[in-house]
């Protein structure tokens, strides 16, 4: 799955409130160090190319059994973009990695002539396909360095980002707004992004606003120690989310934003939380074009209708009509 169960988040939060000692040190809330994922030195999947998968669950199982698997066509640092194209960086979701998220996208985009890259950072060593569980700020710094490496290798001035879940929401938006990414990103194409939080709004508000600030800090510290800070950060009323999205526009001039979301998303609830309601953002509801698309959050990067929309967003001057294909609900 791309996002933690909200039940897991709530249970962890209240276990923290009852179990954490009253003298827990404030230093526990410090940003944890970046963790290099197994099989992905410097963030680059290096365990060989994996087969193309058509659904997220087979891809995730394969990624777990083969840490550091590279999606076909990705991370070729000798690739030079065609004229008019930027290198494309694919950002995975929480609890996922480059292969599990992008085993379908990477080879398809490569066949279209794009230079495609996708990194693994900041996850759980014991579950080697669970990347991006750690503090989003740390992940964003790692992504910043990865983008710089891509720009240097390709001789490009900017990249286009395609991201799913966290990888389309708080991760790239933190990089763009806080780490100078607005000078290096041409397009952000966000697939089912967790922009305004995951899970039901009422539960998110209860966890983050119905407890004292001291207890809130203990919760943050516990998640950080377990290297799952991004779980708490993606609650809509987390301090991180409020800092990133609650202080004026999150979009930046010069970056073209596209958000693609489906109404059957069971992680970003309501699905409208994915959208950025700011000037210049193109928010796309999949069912406005493909009414028989029932894909949920976890299978969103294996939805062929969404893929066509993403390709159109990459190259809007040559956009093609979407050929809709029935997509079952896979939650």
Which ranges hold each PLM region?
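Extracytoplasmic/secreted proteins, especially bacterial periplasmic and envelope-associated proteins
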Residues: 86, 90, 100, 104, ...
């Amino acid at each position: 799955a791309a996002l933690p169960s909200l039940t897991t988040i709530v249970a962890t939060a209240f276990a923290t409130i009852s179990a954490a000692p009253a003298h827990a040190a404030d230093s526990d809330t410090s940003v944890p160090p970046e963790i290099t994922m197994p099989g992905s030195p410097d963030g680059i999947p290096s365990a060989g190319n994996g087969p193309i998968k058509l659904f997220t669950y087979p891809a995730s199982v394969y990624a777990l059994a083969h840490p550091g698997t590279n999606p076909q066509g990705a991370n070729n640092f000798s690739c030079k973009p065609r004229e008019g194209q930027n290198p494309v960086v694919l950002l995975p979701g929480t609890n996922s990695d480059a292969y599990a998220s992008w085993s379908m996208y990477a080879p398809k985009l490569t066949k279209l002539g794009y230079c495609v890259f996708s990194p693994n950072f900041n996850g759980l060593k014991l579950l080697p396909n669970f990347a991006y569980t750690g503090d989003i700020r740390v992940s964003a710094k790692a992504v910043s360095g990865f983008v710089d490496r891509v720009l240097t290798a390709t001789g490009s001035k900017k990249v286009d980002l395609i991201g799913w879940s966290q990888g389309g929401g708080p991760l790239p938006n933190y990089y763009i707004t806080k780490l100078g990414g607005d000078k290096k990103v041409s397009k952000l194409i966000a697939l089912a992004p967790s922009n305004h939080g995951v899970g039901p709004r009422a539960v998110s508000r209860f966890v983050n606003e119905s407890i004292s600030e001291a207890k809130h800090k203990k919760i943050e510290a516990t998640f950080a120690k377990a290297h799952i800070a991004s779980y708490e950060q993606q609650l809509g009323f987390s301090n991180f989310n409020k800092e990133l999205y609650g202080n004026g526009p999150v979009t930046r001039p010069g970056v073209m934003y596209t958000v693609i979301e489906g109404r059957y998303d069971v992680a970003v609830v309501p699905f409208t939380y994915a959208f950025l309601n700011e000037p210049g953002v193109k928010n796309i509801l999949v069912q406005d074009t493909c009414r028989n698309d029932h894909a949920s959050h976890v299978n969103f990067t294996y939805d062929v209708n969404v893929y066509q929309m993403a390709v159109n967003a990459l190259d809007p001057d040559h956009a093609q009509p979407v050929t809709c294909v029935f997509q079952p609900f896979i939650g």
